[in-house]
Amino acid sequence: MAEPEVLKGKLRLPVVGAPLFTISNPDLVIAQCKAGIVGSFPSLNARPTSQLEEWLDQIMSELKSHNRRNPEYPAAPFAVNLIVHRSNNRLEADLELCAKFKVPIIITSLGAREDVNQAVIGWGGITLHDVINQRFAHKAIEKGATGLICVSTGAGGHAGTLSPFAFISETRTWFEGPILCSGSISTGEGVLAARTMGADYAYIGSAFIATKEARAHEAYKQGIAEGSAEDIVYTNLFTGVHGNYLRSSIKQAGLDPDNLPESNPSMMDFGSGAKSDAKAWKNIWGSGQGIGAIQSVESTRDYIDRLYFEYQNAKGRICGCPYS
């Protein structure tokens, strides 16, 4: 793969921090980028739209300042996640702000929009579209997406059911552009595994919930740090799209996690006034299956430093030259 110009030589690790609905914020994104990975956030986390402009200004200003002070260790680029579903009545306004700030990476979800892709490429950015199967993957590329985020089984939040081995290898038979692997990755070994199976980058989300910078309730962070794969429930009840959630939070809501009804996908609403979806993600905690490797709440920098050591050490074990 020819690495996109906006990413070439700018990453300490081949990792993109996934946008976490209600949780990602400027502090987390800035910490991720300063530590050498792509940081991202959903535009809808900034409410109202005017706050999005404040967030973009803060992130860009702090990263530029960091780069001036640390020319030998520049920050990685950041990304904004846009929900392109027809119910998101903020899309046009949010896209205009991203254009104003020339956001380098746009992550698109829940629909493929040719006009959005063209706009981003027009200002020099790239678009990464998250997909759960080959039909959506082909559609995204046909609509002009730069790269694909293959959301596999076990991923936190909205997730698919395909094995990452099957998903990545099949996608690689027809697509030579950037591929990101999403699903249960929380260690440096997992990052290397994603690269080895054919992905260019690992996409990590749930692990960042248990960081000091994340805008999550302390009980949520502890739930990630103390949880395991067995604590994850896959359901479409809360947003109309299948996703993975912490069992304990479902119980706290007075529901039986083993007997949840099906939702009606036609009821999805991602508009700026959508209270039901925001409530679902606030009270019912999304999480992927890879949280068993997260043992404590720590700073974003410490977690990424550990990822880097694990990644280098795993490469060393494979080639017989231990990292030190």
What are these regions (language model features)?
Residues T161-L180, S186-S324:
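Conserved active-site-proximal phosphate/metal-binding subdomains
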Residues M1-P178:
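Active-site entrance/lid segments in N-terminal catalytic domains of soluble metabolic enzymes
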Residues R86, G154, S184-I185, A207:
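Acidic, glycine-rich active-site loops and adjacent beta-strand->loop/helix elements
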